[in-house]
Amino acid sequence: MSIEQLKDQIPDFAKDVRLNLSSMASDETLSPQAKYGLFVACAIATRNPMVMAAFEAVAAAQLSATALAAAKSAAAIMAMNNVYYRFVHLASNKEYATMPARLRMNVIANPGVDKADFELWSLAVSAINGCGTCIDAHEKVLQEAAVPAASIQTAVRFAAIIQSVAVAIEAAGVTVALAAE
């Protein structure tokens, strides 16, 4: 499935989402690896099979096998870290913040691709998953790596668009299912 075919699945009530998807696809703010890896990581974070399939198909033609695997790794490791660190942050009992996480996360130190790209993907997935602690940590690493604020903002904007595509498609499916009853 292509992005154009995915766009065709977005219902009219989400016209803005469709337009944002078109704009995102043609945006050249990020390098190709950063952009297409971000597409994959964020699509996985939506948990929508149609969105995942479309973005992986588009990205596979643009990314090396190593970069594609790293983007998937970013989504997987953030799925774990975002839950854990969001809990630590939100729990009233601050003792948890002093305890070792005891979670393996070696891929963050050695992602197999440019570290800034991996951090950008991790930040975007953390935005989708709503982990403020992870957002702050990844944004700090990106600032230290001299990644421009415009690139960071673009990554989060893309995450928001990809998430909205998944929600619009799911909402359309519910509408169709209810109409059939």
Swiss-Prot record:
Gene3D superfamilies: AhpD-like (1.20.1290.10). SUPFAM superfamilies: AhpD-like (SSF69118). Its EC number is 1.11.1.28. One of its GO terms (biological process) is response to oxidative stress. InterPro entries: AhpD, AhpD-like, AhpD_core, CMD-like. The active site is at C131 (proton donor), C134 (cysteine sulfenic acid (-soh) intermediate). It holds the Pfam family CMD. GO terms for molecular function: alkyl hydroperoxide reductase activity; disulfide oxidoreductase activity; hydroperoxide reductase activity; peroxiredoxin activity. Keywords: Antioxidant, Disulfide bond, Oxidoreductase, Peroxidase, Redox-active center. It catalyses: N(6)-[(R)-dihydrolipoyl]-L-lysyl-[lipoyl-carrier protein] + a hydroperoxide = N(6)-[(R)-lipoyl]-L-lysyl-[lipoyl-carrier protein] + an alcohol + H2O. Disulfide bonds join C131-C134. It is an enzyme of class 1 (oxidoreductase). PANTHER family: ALKYL HYDROPEROXIDE REDUCTASE AHPD. Belongs to the AhpD family. Antioxidant protein with alkyl hydroperoxidase activity. Required for the reduction of the AhpC active site cysteine residues and for the regeneration of the AhpC enzyme activity. This is Alkyl hydroperoxide reductase AhpD. It comes from Bradyrhizobium sp. (strain ORS 278).
